[in-house]
A protein has these predicted regions:
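Cationic, low-complexity basic patches in intrinsically disordered or flexible, solvent-exposed regions
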Residues: 2
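Non-catalytic terminal and connector segments of soluble metabolic enzymes
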Residues: 8-152
Length: 152
């Protein structure tokens, strides 16, 4: 399905795909199901889902914008402390809708009712990562999923 539309008053909008990573704190707290349920309750379509351990190479690629910061080694350690759950979602304007549902990076600043506001602890232990733009989503889909692993 390439496009969805409501009626003659709405504009055709392309379906988007995005990536959500349930981070180690999410896995360790056993709240992965709660996170997925929140996405499904919004009508988001899960098109891929897999547990994986992230090696240093994939993390350096994923967090390339942070490698020069002194806290980068802490990010590496945290993201390798347990497996993560990679989730691919599809829907209309899904990148922004997911960002709205999860809340800002800093869980202490996230509103109640958002994933991070309800379940996160701080900037690092904030339960999930989500693609922030179409270009990032495209790169992350390729980084975390092989072509045959997506059901759309």
């Amino acid at each position: 399905k390439l496009f969805s539309f409501g009626n003659f008053l709405t504009v055709w909008r392309p379906m988007e795909k995005t990536v959500v990573l349930s981070k180690p704190d999410c896995v360790q707290k056993k709240i992965m199901g709660e996170v997925i349920k929140r996405f499904e309750n919004q009508g988001f379509q899960v098109i891929g889902c897999k547990m994986m351990r992230l090696d240093e190479a994939i993390l350096r690629d994923h967090y390339s914008h942070l490698t020069e910061f002194p806290f980068f080694s802490e990010i590496l350690g945290f993201m390798q402390s347990s497996p993560i759950l990679a989730i691919a979602l599809e829907g209309e304007a899904i990148i922004q809708k997911v960002r709205d549902l999860i809340g800002p990076t800093d869980s202490t600043a996230a509103a109640k009712g958002t994933v991070r506001g309800d379940l996160g602890e701080d900037k690092m232990r904030n339960v999930v990562h989500a693609s922030d733009a179409p270009e990032a989503a495209e790169a992350e889909l390729k980084r975390f999923f092989d072509a045959g692993e997506l059901m759309a």
